[in-house]
Amino acid sequence: MSQPPAAHVPVLYTQVLEGLQVTENGTYLDGTFGRGGHARGVLEHLGPGGRLLVMDKDPEAVAVSQHTFGGDARVSIHPGSFARLVQVVAAATVDGILLDLGVSSPQLDVAGRGFSFGKDGPLDMRMDPDSGQSAAGWLAQATDREIADVLWTYGEERQSRRIARAIVARRGEQPLLRTAQLADLIASVMPRGDSKTHPATRSFQAIRIHINRELADLEAGLDAALGALKPGGRLAVISFHSLEDRIVKQFMARYAKAPPSNRRLPEAQPFVPTLQLVSGAIKADDSELAVNPRARSAVLRVAEKLGMENRESGMGKGHGAAASRFPTPDSRFPTSPNGDAP
């Protein structure tokens, strides 16, 4: 199988294309174009009758897609989040959908985007800089409880309360406007440890997820993708942290597997699967990690939408689809004796 251009190394490139099973005349949607590494691979397998729809909420990624593929009649470009893919495609018309979640390498590498604690820049973190509130704006007005809830819920940061109190105290003295300011402040209040991970890692992740509504978009996008796929169509999702992967795993399982029965409840209607799991968690091997260390946390999951004839053959007893909600920062979390999250 061909390899992507050296200038951009998309994670799990070969595994994604194998999972999507791209056909010459199929219709595919890349909901997170980024810099187009996976999209190029899909196009290599499409013939003149194939179609590729690309989406991205980042205006810079949209500009790259227009420059790279604007002259290709097989490609249509749609600015915006994949959560709104129902505005781009009709139901049951797509052969494959790819969602490559999280922040992209270009977003991390450009200090001016404000995503990285390793590069000083404006404290922004918005994937679409023209929409919504920046990280600096939110931190300037959120209460310490709201900040702590976000850090714990989206970053699983054990020192969430301590960090939140420090942010509120510091902003009373001077505004937090730069990524280095925030990273240094977090590092200054964290207990000393042996971890090789930067002390601001979890907090930056949590704030970014909150600012961009990433988990809300993910759940909406998964629901929309299921409706957009044809029977036999494939959904491939790459996640980069446990919160994302948990949502993806639970979503696929909810439509593929009958829930456990409960003898205390009345007999339910037979469970009819909508998805078939193509693979479990797929991770990068050592050869990929050697050239692309950022792939170390990537997890790919693939599922196939079933047609009615296949759904009936997979019927089992169950109690219907249980609600699967992503965590919200409004939820209360327990505290340890020192007042921080456990």
UniProtKB/Swiss-Prot annotation:
GO BP annotations of the record are: rRNA base methylation
Q: What role is this protein assigned?
A: Specifically methylates the N4 position of cytidine in position 1402 (C1402) of 16S rRNA.
Q: Which GO terms describe its molecular function?
A: rRNA (cytosine-N4-)-methyltransferase activity
The first-level EC class reads transferase
Task: Give compartment(s).
Answer: Cytoplasm
List the GO cellular component terms. cytoplasm
What lineage is this protein's organism placed in?
A: Bacteria, Pseudomonadati, Pseudomonadota, Gammaproteobacteria, Lysobacterales
Indicate which residues the UniProt annotation says bind S-adenosyl-L-methionine: 36-38, 56, 82, 100, 107
Q: What family, per the record?
A: Belongs to the methyltransferase superfamily. RsmH family.
Taken from the UniProt record, the cysteine pairs bridged by disulfide bonds within this chain are: none
Q: Where is the composition biased (Polar residues)?
A: 333-342
Q: Which UniProt keywords apply?
A: Cytoplasm, Methyltransferase, rRNA processing, S-adenosyl-L-methionine, Transferase
What is the protein name for this chain? Ribosomal RNA small subunit methyltransferase H
Entry's Pfam families? Methyltransf_5
Q: Where is the signal peptide?
A: none
Matching SUPFAM superfamilies:
Putative methyltransferase TM0872, insert domain, S-adenosyl-L-methionine-dependent methyltransferases
Any idea of its EC number? 2.1.1.199
Recorded catalytic activity of this chain's protein: cytidine(1402) in 16S rRNA + S-adenosyl-L-methionine = N(4)-methylcytidine(1402) in 16S rRNA + S-adenosyl-L-homocysteine + H(+)
- Annotated region Disordered: the residues are 309-342
| Gene label | rsmH
